[in-house]
Structure formats: structure tokens, C-alpha cells
């Protein structure tokens, strides 16, 4: 009777049109329901049945209905699909191929088929794959996917590395080698013979791609520092297929226990690596540094042939400097180490007063077994040898920034603008509330930003440091010279890591043109600088994601025990705290309910960066060091969950006043004026 009734269809359409609609982003939960997030302050509940039609992150238009006296959102139209290409695990259901996305908030199995060229019979339960979403339930009535790539079987020991690289669409291996390598520029760029100069390298004990060597001598009023940098552009022609591949990769990918080079290993680890006792082509800079640490303007760039006279390690040099350890090395190199130490201390002192010095944070080194298992995590503090190399490289990059800025006018510059324009008002409001002696125009300038950072670094608490960083901009790559507020410098152009950074290869070619007196190559495109910026962030995510996986495996045995860790609060969110364990660098999450299972009394306030008890008492804040215990280590989501080592036991909740008379004691009653 009602089938194909046009009047009924028209009535339904009219009813639908009269239902209010909202656009927003779907935020899933781990309990089946979700929310439609319209803006920062507005969200609507999405019941589990409606969540079956969408995925976390989808942008949708939804009908806002009232069900059981509560407003709920029913997704109605897909505006932007959040998932297209994704990493998943194979799930067999009644002998049919399904995939489950490797995402903590996307848990439902999706029907799947394989792309042409793959054999469905080869896939088994738990295999890791890359898939593409082909059908969306809100559009097509159901979800379906196509498996496009095999990553690894569940038994593969390399799963953390291969899965993370595949997720970010990065190569697992280095570029293909060439049958023969030839220097392409010998006649055009004469090289000074410095093979007799006692250059030396300082690197990690396991480092193979050594790209910088140093030599120093004392002058009457300071030091002369020679910085020799490996020269892969002597072998890689601009515009060649290998050059294009290096540009696409942008950086060597560094991960716990391994790396994927930007250029073939024959170059990075052999022909260009500045190995002890082997002659190498290099690009060099001669720097002059005054006794007080001032880096003088006079800088000479030139091509040279060098031979490293000693391969030193950070630990050996630091042990020599800090504990008097004897070093059995070339006498010419040994005589330079006191000079390096003195120059480094002078440069640190100068930059601390006139620029900015990054706070010393330790590195964390994963010691892995043959099958990729984590045997130990070693804390490696930044010691004097690390600072020797760091200060030398920073000085060399400052000089490159000067030369490229003045003589070329472009290059690949690292720029950092301090605060984004739209963040300045928020930053100054925060500083005023903290009684900081700064004005808006002041902190927008390079000198004012440096003064602010130095003032904050001298505070007893790290709370303001954690808060103000939320307003700071990200560092970018730019073809134009520009200030780097984070370092407190007018210009900064890196050229000291061309084996592992494509931007440094670009700067090498421009510096070589200056040396040869030739017209420099073309200005780097906006497309290239944006690509380099994006890849730098991506590679940090890769290192973090693999680290998170390995941390969960390593710390699983400590979860649920009474082992206590020191942890720094690095973020305060509405749901809880994010902390970094100081013993090993792992990032853990402490849910608010683990602090106090009473959401009426406990508030985790992101805006203030603090956790409050009963609205007033500060329990925790950004930058605070607290003791925690691990409760869970969940490999499926690569998450570590913690709780306070000492349980918070608050006093009785304050009693709310029952009347205005109760709220104002007699002795505090307002006086008549």
C-alpha cells in the first residue's frame, strides 16, 4: 500500500529537510560511540549504530535529532573521507578476506579483495598489508577495501620498522647503486691538498656515514677552525636520476637500530665517508673565532682533498676532557683537543649571552638483539665532545648563511619566526599573567625573543616554558634568507650534512659556484622548500612511531609492577597527562581517572597547563617531575599507561554553600560605601 508512494516519499523528504543539520568531524571513542565535533566548544553525541556508517576523522554533515531527551547526531552526508590509504592486518572471517585498520579508533573489520597481481591465497591471519578504501558506508551502504601491498608477516622481526615506513610511504632500502662512480668536477673545481693537515672526526661508535672533520689552531686573538665536509655532489650530477631520487627522499631516515640512506650506501658509508687514513674530496670552510667566542665575518670556503688522521668517539673525547682518560691517537690530533675544548666553551658562552643555546637533553640509544628485540635503552647525555661538534657545525652553518645571503641571495635556509602573528596576543596575555617584563612588539623581534627565552630559562619552574612553546611557530625551510629565532641568529643555512640532507646538497652546489666565481644555479623552488619541511617533520614522526613500538615491548615486563619511574609532564589534556620517563625517554599517558576517579573534583585544564583539585588546588603542572608506575603496555595501540606512584588522597570535598548568607561570612560582609 505504501510502496512507491510519492506522497509518503515527499513527506519524508520534508521532515528530513526540517531536521537541523550540522557539519563537523567524527571523533570516535574506544567504546563504540563517538562525537560530531563542530568546533572547539560544540560537539554532539553519535550513538554506536550511527558510528557504523563512518570512520574516525571523517568530515560529515549530520542530522541533529532528539532521542531520549538528548541531542544526537546522525551522519547524513560524507563531505571529506579521512581514510583512503591505510595500514592494516589481515582478518579471516568465514574464510573470507577482511582487514582491520591499524588505528586505535578504527576497530571494525572491513571486507577486502586484493589488487591484480596479488594472490589472495597467500594472505593469512595477522599479516600486515597496505590497503585502499574503495567503498564508504555513508555513500555506498558498506565499507570495502583493496589490498595493494604486502608489508610483512606477523612473525617478521622487522614489523615495527616495515609497518611504520609503509604507513608513511617511505622506502625500506637505499637507492640503487651505480655500476661505477666517477668524480664529475675535478677540472672545474681545483682542490687544495690538505692531506697533511691533522683533521679528525668525532662521531658515535657505530656511525658509518661520517660527513664532517675538524682541525683547529690557536691564533694570537682566538682560533682558526677548519671544517671539512664530505662532498657527495662531486659524484651526483644536478638533475640526474640519482639527484632526483635524493630530492624525493629529502633526508636519510634515522630509526632505532638502523637507517635508510638518502643516497646509495657506497657513497654515504664508503666513498664520501671521512674514514681515518683515506683521502676524500671535501668542501671546506676556514672560520675565525675570537677569544670571547665571537664568530668573525671573515670566512673562506674552498674545495679540498683531506685525510682524517683520527676517528674519535664522543665518549672517548668526553672521558679525556672530563676524567683525564689517555688517548692513544695521532699526536697532532691530541694537541688540538684542548684548543677544541676552549673554543667550544667560548662559543657556548658567547651564544648564551648574545643568541640562544638549546637546553641539554639526553639522547636515548636502543640496544637491539639480532631479531630486533630491545636488550637495553641507554641514556646518552650531551657531553663536551657532543658540544665540540655541535658548536663547530653551528658556526659553519652561520657562515654559510652569511655567504649565501650576501653573495647569492638565496639557498636553503632554516628559518624560525618565533611567534606566529596570530599567536602574539595569546603569548603576551600569558606573559602578562606571569608578570613577565615584556611587551608585544618586543617579543616579535629577534632580540626581544632571545631576551624572553633567556628570562624563562632562568625561572625556577618549567611551567611557563611549556605554556609559551604552544604559541611558537614551527621551523621551516626557505629559499630566502631569514632569521632563526630558535637559535637567536640572523640567518642559518646548513651545509654540514650533505650525505643525509638534500638541502645541504643544494647549498653545496651554490657555495661551489661562489668558490669558482660562476653564476649560481637556480633559486630553489617553493615546492622544494615545502617538500623538505614536510619530510623533516615526517621523519621525526617515523622515529617517534618506531620508538613508541619498541618502548611498549621493552617496558611490558614493568607494567603492573611496583617499579617507580621519574617522569616529566610534557602536556596536560582534558583526558589526562602526557609524560616522558626520564630513565629511558618513553612517552606515557596518565588518564585523569588514574589520578582521581572523581571527575567532579579533578580537572585537567589544557588552557592553564595544570591539574586542579576542587577547582583551586594545583595538583600537577607542565614541566613538573613526578613519580609514576606503569599499569599497562598495549602493543596493539603502542601505548603505555601510567598512574601516580603515590595515590592522591584528597580531603573531603568542599561543601557547596546553600544560600547567599552561607556564602559570605559575617566578618567578610561587604561594607556600605
UniProtKB/Swiss-Prot annotation:
PANTHER family linked: EXORIBONUCLEASE 2, RIBONUCLEASE
Enzyme Commission number, as recorded: 3.1.13.1
Keyword list, A-Z: Cytoplasm, Exonuclease, Hydrolase, Nuclease, RNA-binding
Signal sequence extent: none
GO BP term, example: mRNA catabolic process
GO CC, alphabetical: cytosol
Occurrences of domain S1 motif (ranges): 562-645
Biological role stated in the UniProt entry: Involved in mRNA degradation. Hydrolyzes single-stranded polyribonucleotides processively in the 3' to 5' direction.
Gene Ontology terms, MF aspect: exoribonuclease II activity; RNA binding
Reactions catalysed according to its record: Exonucleolytic cleavage in the 3'- to 5'-direction to yield nucleoside 5'-phosphates
Family of this protein: Belongs to the RNR ribonuclease family. RNase II subfamily.
Pfam families per UniProt: CSD2, OB_RNB, RNB
Compartments where found: Cytoplasm
RNB domain boundaries: 191-516
Record gene name: rnb
Protein known as: Exoribonuclease 2
Region (Disordered): 650-673
